[in-house]
């Protein structure tokens, strides 16, 4: 027999948890739980990869959640008022997949057999949009802890906005030792307690095991005490992992707590009842092997030599979720039909968009004025906020600095659950994951801000947002050495290049206030995460962007200046490509190049604003060639790393060192971001190209080093 847990091992099918003879229904439930344990062994074994032990230990918990507690409709997985389920310890994904299959979400037994295989719906960790019923992408430990808090904020905000008849659900989050060791869990749990978020039920799978071995190797936190200090309701239920009635009672107690989040501490035994792997690190992340599986199945009363065994009566037990969920949803639909609220606002909120015509409220900025793009965003947000019903904004202690202050909006709090202003505190990582949770909950379009350099603190959350196509908007400001005296610790250099390399993330760096308005419009209308990269310093509002940005920005790149004076005969001699605060420098440099100087002929330079590479790459070849014609030398000008610019440019004025502490204008000048220096580099590029064209045929088929003219530090 396996090593039994100290208190309550799984009762044999013939007995109830209290030792009394079990009813046929109880016997069927226990068989169902054991079938889930069997699937948790079979799928990783077939894949020769996967995490078995946690799924086995938590099978009774999953059974209680999906059959007794949670409100959901498998036939309509996106029903707005469903309870949300987040598996933060996403390595136990086979547990979730098994429940989605059994409960009728559309997964099949063949999908379970294809666990972790190319093209299957059952990936190694849960992925939003990959299979029905997966609320959010998890896997990197702790992310689900913070995303669940975001879902709790969304539920409270929407309940206050639209009423409890339409929004009345719980968020359940399962997390493990690893999740709670991660720093993001501290950030998120602290804020959840401060916000007094009820309807938020976390189950801590306290199994004392990590990959390296027992948690005592590196972890001795008093977890209940820690969460009590955060202001949570804590229920340490001990050894009841196999007692379904005790589990249900604990969950319902937690669900009744309305004024604070709840933590149920559950002592489980990873891999139980495996005779040799229970409570071992090997049970965490490896298939059990055929012999161990056979012995364990015999203990569980399953056919030892049959894989993926699901008897009809077990499938019928779990498929009761379909009519039960349909009845719950239809009752909700009746309430919705009789609701007298603002349906246009409801529809727009759940679509993550503005009301019809919202973009007509975008401000137009006066040419010639000086406006930092972070201040332009502030103006855009406040001009349109009332027409974007789901808009919620906040920052990591930089609300005013990053342009995300909603004038007149209440602070999100127990006293003002309708509050649209979230003060995340100095918790960038939690903010990022909470934004993803809000977006995937639905009904909320979150905007979150911090200094661009500190986007690094958010990076794991941003990556999951991009992977899962969460509709979130990041306001990352103070975007270059132009921020000034705070120096290189706060001056972003490599961030633009690294974030552009992230699949699924739109990175937009507007040249001035009018471009910023168009970027805000595109971000609100988007369906994926958008990062707005904005200046601290004032920038001139350009006449050229005022005329052309409304049609050009959404295409990612467009011609700002064909040639000073407007001449359009023949191709340009040179193309200057700029983003953000460097576009106006390029415009001024083009004017200098157009003027004949002593010993230098006039140069006809085109200026291109390229605010968003992702949008530009989405255009057809003809459009891209019309903006960046082939065969014309190109010089890119951007106050960040040169990495990646060889896609578009022959040379760059860029920064490949860390910055320096100095007033912003001085720092930009020292690093070469002046019209005079850009014009000088442009002439050097033209000279190099002409010299190259005179080489012999062998040299002509080669290319000069595109990086010869990169700036590497102060000039």
Task: Locate predicted features.
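A short glycine/serine-rich beta->alpha loop
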Residues: 26, 43-52, 80-88, 131-142, ...
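N-terminal capping segment at the start of a domain
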Residues: 35-49, 204-207
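A short, small-residue-rich loop immediately preceding and capping a beta-strand
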Residues: 47, 83-84, 134-137, 164-182, ...
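Cofactor-binding active-site loop characterized by glycine-rich and histidine/acidic residues
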Residues: 57-195, 405-406, 434, 438, ...
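Glycine-rich phosphate/pyrophosphate-binding loops
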Residues: 73-74, 155-165, 440-457, 472, ...
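Terminal amphipathic helices with adjacent charged low-complexity linkers/tails
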Residues: 80-81, 262-356
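Thiamine diphosphate
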Residues: 117-129, 147, 157-168, 185-309, ...
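Non-catalytic terminal/interface segments that mediate subunit docking, oligomerization
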Residues: 330-471, 528, 549-559, 577-580, ...
């Amino acid at each position: 027999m396996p090593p039994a847990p100290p208190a309550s091992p799984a009762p044999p099918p013939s007995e109830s948890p209290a030792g009394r003879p079990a009813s046929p229904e109880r016997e069927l439930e226990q068989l169902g739980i054991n079938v889930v344990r069997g699937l948790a062994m079979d799928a990783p074994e077939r894949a020769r990869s996967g995490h078995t032990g946690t799924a086995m230990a938590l099978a009774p918990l999953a059974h209680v959640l999906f059959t007794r507690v949670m409100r959901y409709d498998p036939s309509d997985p996106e029903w707005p008022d469903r309870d949300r389920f987040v598996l933060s310890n996403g390595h136990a994904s086979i547990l979730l997949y098994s429940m989605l299959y059994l409960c009728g979400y559309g997964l099949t037994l063949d999908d379970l057999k294809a666990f972790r295989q190319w093209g299957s719906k059952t990936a190694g960790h849960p992925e939003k949009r990959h299979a029905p019923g997966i609320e959010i992408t998890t896997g990197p430990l702790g992310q689900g802890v913070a995303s669940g808090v975001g879902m709790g904020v969304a539920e409270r905000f929407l309940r206050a906005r639209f009423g409890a008849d339409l929004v009345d659900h719980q968020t359940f989050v399962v997390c493990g030792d690893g999740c709670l060791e991660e720093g993001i869990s501290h950030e998120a749990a602290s804020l959840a307690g401060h916000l007094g978020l009820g309807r938020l039920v976390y189950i801590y799978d306290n199994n004392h095991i990590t990959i390296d071995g027992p948690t005592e190797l590196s972890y001795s936190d008093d977890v209940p005490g820690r969460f009590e200090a955060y202001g949570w309701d804590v229920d340490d239920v001990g050894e009841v992992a196999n007692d379904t009635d005790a589990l249900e009672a604990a969950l319902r107690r937690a669900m009744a707590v309305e004024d604070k989040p709840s933590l149920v501490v559950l002592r489980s035994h990873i891999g139980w009842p495996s005779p040799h792997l229970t409570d071992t690190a090997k049970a965490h992340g490896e298939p059990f092997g055929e012999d161990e599986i056979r012995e364990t199945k015999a203990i569980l009363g399953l056919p030892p030599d049959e894989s993926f065994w699901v008897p009809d009566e077990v499938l019928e037990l779990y498929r009761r979720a379909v009519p039960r969920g349909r009845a719950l949803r239809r009752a909700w639909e009746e309430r919705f039909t009789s609701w007298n609220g603002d349906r246009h606002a409801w529809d727009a909120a759940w679509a993550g968009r503005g009301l019809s015509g919202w973009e007509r409220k975008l401000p137009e900025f006066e040419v010639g004025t000086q406006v930092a793009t972070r201040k332009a965003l502030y103006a855009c947000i406040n001009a349109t906020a009332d027409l974007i019903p789901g808009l919620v904004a906040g920052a990591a202690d930089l609300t005013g600095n990053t342009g995300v202050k909603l004038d007149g909006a209440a602070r999100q709090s127990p006293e003002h659950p309708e509050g649209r202003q979230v003060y995340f505190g100095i918790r960038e990582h939690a903010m990022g994951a909470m934004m993803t949770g809000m977006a995937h909950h639905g009904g909320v379009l979150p905007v979150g801000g911090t200094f661009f350099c500190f986007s690094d603190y958010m990076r794991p959350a941003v990556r999951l947002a991009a992977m899962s196509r969460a509709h979130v908007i990041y306001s990352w400001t103070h975007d270059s050495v132009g921020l000034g005296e705070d120096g290189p610790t706060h001056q972003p250099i490599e961030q633009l290049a690294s974030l552009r390399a992230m699949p699924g993330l739109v990175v937009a760096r507007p040249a001035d206030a009018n471009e910023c308005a168009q970027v805000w419009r595109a971000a609100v209308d988007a369906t994926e995460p958008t990062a707005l990269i904005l200046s601290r310093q004032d920038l001139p509002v350009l006449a050229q962007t005022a005329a052309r940005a409304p049609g050009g920005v959404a295409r990612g790149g467009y011609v700002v200046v064909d040639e000073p004076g407007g001449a359009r005969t023949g191709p340009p001699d040179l193309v200057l490509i700029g983003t953000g605060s460097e576009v106006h420098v390029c415009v001024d440099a083009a004017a200098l190049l157009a003027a004949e100087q002593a010993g230098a002929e006039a140069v006809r330079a085109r200026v291109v604003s390229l605010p968003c590479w992702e949008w530009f790459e989405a255009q057809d070849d003809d459009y891209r060639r019309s903006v960046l014609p082939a065969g014309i030398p190109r010089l890119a000008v951007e106050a960040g790393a040169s990495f990646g610019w060889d896609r578009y440019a022959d040379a760059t004025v860029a920064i490949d060192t860390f910055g320096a502490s100095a007033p912003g204008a001085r720092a930009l000048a020292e690093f070469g971001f002046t019209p005079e220096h850009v014009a000088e580099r442009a002439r050097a590029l033209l000279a190099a190209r002409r010299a190259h064209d005179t080489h012999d045929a062998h040299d002509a088929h080669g290319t000069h080093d595109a990086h010869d003219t990169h700036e590497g530090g102060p000039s």
